[in-house]
């Protein structure tokens, strides 16, 4: 039985990315860890129409203690957040991986964005990485004006991912794999539930899926 080499697999994903014109959003709570890991991975593999967002009231990152989180407003540049944490306690934030995470974020885009504030862009697929975020995205879409005759479908897919650096990597990889399957599937929208069911059987990654129009 033949197996694909990593180079062959990477080439396949790159080919899929080059052909993909879907607008895809990655959403987590603070647009810092899980959504940015996925955003970074997709861009790294050649996908073009990728955005990422958070749904919380503000961006919360671990601080000196569980009772002292670092709070930043959406729109605060990642470079500014990086400098703030580095000046606060460089050793701590190197040790817990926050500075490394922020270096990645800086390479992807300028600043964290809030999902509820993006009213212009339309997406065909929205990946969320926590059920509370999934619920927040759905609640937001339900509150939007749907009187237009130009409503478009959006598939919201939640992959349940713990908010750790390690889990974020796995969640991003699974989102990439699902997208690759979607791109190779004719009439994918009709078959998406089965695609996700099959993926769950293979990976045990819990998921939720709903179709909305906006």
From Swiss-Prot:
Main subcellular localization, coarse class?
nucleus
Q: Pfam families under this entry?
A: Ssu72 (PF04722)
Identify the EC number(s): 3.1.3.16
| Protein's cellular compartments | Nucleus
What GO molecular functions are on record for this protein? RNA polymerase II CTD heptapeptide repeat phosphatase activity
Quickly give the catalysed reaction: O-phospho-L-seryl-[protein] + H2O = L-seryl-[protein] + phosphate; O-phospho-L-threonyl-[protein] + H2O = L-threonyl-[protein] + phosphate
* GO CC entries: mRNA cleavage and polyadenylation specificity factor complex
Keywords for the protein's UniProt record, in alphabetical order: Hydrolase, mRNA processing, Nucleus, Protein phosphatase
InterPro entries (alphabetical): RNA_pol_II_suA
One Gene Ontology term from the biological process aspect of the record: mRNA processing
Q: Which family does it belong to?
A: Belongs to the SSU72 phosphatase family.
Instruction: Name the job this protein performs.
Output: May be involved in the C-terminal domain of RNA polymerase II dephosphorylation, RNA processing and termination.
Q: What is this protein called?
A: RNA polymerase II subunit A C-terminal domain phosphatase SSU72
Record the organism. Answer: Dictyostelium discoideum
